[in-house]
């Protein structure tokens, strides 16, 4: 995790969020304060630190207005482990389905990946050097030792190589390189480092992914799979790949060997406990709607299972136990049918910060198309530029696109900013199809162009074909 990122002030965090997300300033402000409070807590003495727990956030707003994106970007800014789960995927204890503790295990998996990627990045140069050394030996191999060919496994001559050769080391089976081979390797090394051999084919041994077990329930499946992976020896298969691909594979393997996995796992557990963010989407779907019946009872059961995780409990993972007390939980939902007050009182109390996100207006759609650092307009311009087609959007065209997207949302299901993907894809459909045959073309997207391509939905109220 970036140590400097956690020291960002709330204004700095909001400023960075503004580069990717339009509007919703109240939501940005609240998540920025929650993030800053984590830094403040880290500066306190141990006794006070243990008493301060995160103030969880409940985001209320329709789909497509930025709830998930705000939380995801916030986590990315500080390198915190983040997962998004859907409350409707969980079932009460004793029923078939995912148990609520799986969200914590998934978060720890993300934390482990983040920590190991960070550590691998620190030993990247050494790993690449080792990979290049190995590639040189593969491109200019030494003679094999014939006398010891089957010395590693006496059963190999009987079973024809079907037995795993434990402890076999290819380099130990090679004769010391002759002067001629040393000279060739020196020449190959120079060519390799100069990038002249990137497309050359080379045969390497790579670890084979173990097959998944499909006959068990989700959580049971994962636990048994993890246990089997630890018990079974790692099987390697030979593949022929280009040098540039082989370097990546070998460098990753060497980096994996260079890092201390035990301390990395412990660091990941600490990171998940202190900086983890769990985004629980569709939490309104497990709220009781006061209609009674078995469905309400089942929903309350899921809420009561989520409650101890949010309150703080110890969950066992394959890396060790992790305490959820200081994790930040962000609940989100549209709350069209139910209200936040329909959640059980204990769970309501665990989400003390409420923020309502606004529905998107035409002006919001215009800003979404123009302002973000990697806006949709810029994405489509970049995609078509790969075909040497230059696309220019006029301000009038962008406004017209925003008006159509807003109108479609009003006339059908409101899916927020996601509607822009549908509209843009439909408008640029013909151009994307013809682009490979239009080198060096320049296409101006005007309001008239937008109307011509989208007249079927801008004038026709039967918009069912455009509902995502």
Swiss-Prot record:
Subcellular location: Cytoplasm
GO BP: protein unfolding; proteolysis involved in protein catabolic process
Molecular function, one GO term: peptidase activity
SUPFAM superfamilies registered for this protein in UniProt: P-loop containing nucleoside triphosphate hydrolases
Region listing for Disordered, in residue ranges: 166-187
Gene3D superfamilies registered for this protein in UniProt: 1.10.8.60, P-loop containing nucleotide triphosphate hydrolases
Composition bias type Acidic residues, residue spans: 169-178
One Pfam family here: ClpB_D2-small
Residues holding ATP: 22, 64-69, 281, 346, 418
Alphabetically ordered keywords of this record: ATP-binding, Chaperone, Cytoplasm, Nucleotide-binding
Main location: cytoplasm
Taxonomy, superkingdom: Bacteria
Signal peptide: none
Keyword check for 4Fe-4S: no
GO cellular component terms, A-Z: HslUV protease complex
NCBIfam families named in the record: hslU (TIGR00390), PRK05201.1 (NF003544)
Function of the molecule: ATPase subunit of a proteasome-like degradation complex; this subunit has chaperone activity. The binding of ATP and its subsequent hydrolysis by HslU are essential for unfolding of protein substrates subsequently hydrolyzed by HslV. HslU recognizes the N-terminal part of its protein substrates and unfolds these before they are guided to HslV for hydrolysis.
Family: Belongs to the ClpX chaperone family. HslU subfamily.
Subunit structure: A double ring-shaped homohexamer of HslV is capped on each side by a ring-shaped HslU homohexamer. The assembly of the HslU/HslV complex is dependent on binding of ATP.
Record protein name field: ATP-dependent protease ATPase subunit HslU
């Amino acid at each position: 995790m970036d140590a400097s990122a956690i020291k960002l002030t709330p204004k700095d965090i909001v400023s960075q969020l503004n580069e990717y997300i339009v509007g919703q300033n109240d939501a940005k402000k609240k998540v920025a304060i929650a993030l800053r409070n984590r830094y403040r807590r880290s500066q306190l003495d141990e006794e006070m630190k243990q008493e301060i727990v995160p103030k969880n956030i409940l985001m209320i707003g329709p789909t497509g207005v930025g709830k998930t994106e705000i939380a995801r970007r916030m986590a990315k800014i500080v390198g915190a482990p983040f997962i998004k789960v859907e409350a409707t995927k969980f079932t009460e204890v004793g029923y078939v389905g995912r148990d609520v503790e799986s969200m914590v295990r998934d978060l720890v998996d993300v934390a482990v990946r983040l920590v190991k990627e960070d550590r691998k990045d620190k030993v990247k140069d050494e790993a690449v050097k080792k990979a290049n050394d190995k590639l040189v030996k593969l491109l200019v191999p030494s003679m094999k030792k014939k006398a010891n060919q089957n010395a590693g496994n006496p059963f190999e001559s009987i079973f024809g190589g079907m037995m795993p050769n434990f402890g076999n080391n290819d380099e130990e089976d090679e004769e010391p390189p002759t002067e001629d081979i040393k000279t060739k390797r020196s020449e190959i090394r120079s060519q390799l480092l100069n990038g002249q051999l990137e497309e050359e084919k080379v045969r390497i041994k790579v670890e084979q992914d173990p097959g998944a077990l499909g006959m068990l329930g989700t959580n049971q499946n994962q636990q048994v799979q993890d246990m089997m992976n630890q018990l079974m020896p790692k099987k390697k298969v030979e593949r022929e790949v280009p040098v540039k691909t082989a370097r990546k594979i070998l460098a990753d393997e060497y980096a994996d060997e260079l890092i201390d996995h035990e301390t990395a796992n412990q660091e990941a557990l600490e990171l998940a406990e202190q900086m983890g963010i769990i985004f629980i989407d569709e939490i309104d779907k497990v709220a009781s709607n006061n209609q009674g019946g078995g469905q309400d009872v089942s929903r309350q059961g899921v809420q009561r299972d989520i409650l101890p995780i949010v309150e703080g409990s110890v969950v066992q993972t394959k890396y060790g136990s992790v305490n959820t007390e200081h994790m930040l939980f962000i609940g989100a939902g549209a709350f069209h049918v139910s209200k936040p007050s329909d959640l059980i009182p204990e769970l309501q109390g665990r989400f003390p910060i409420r923020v309502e996100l606004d529905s998107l207006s035409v002006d919001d759609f215009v800003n979404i198309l123009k302002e973000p650092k990697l806006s949709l307009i810029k994405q489509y311009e970049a995609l078509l530029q790969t075909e040497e087609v230059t696309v220019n959007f006029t301000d009038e065209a962008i406004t017209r696109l925003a008006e159509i997207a807003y109108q479609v949302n009003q006339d059908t299901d409101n899916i927020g900013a996601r509607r822009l993907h549908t509209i843009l894809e439909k408008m640029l459909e013909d151009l994307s199809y013809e682009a490979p045959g239009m080198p060096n073309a320049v296409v101006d997207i005007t309001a008239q162009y937008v109307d011509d391509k989208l007249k079927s939905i801008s004038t026709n109220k039967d918009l069912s074909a455009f509902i995502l």
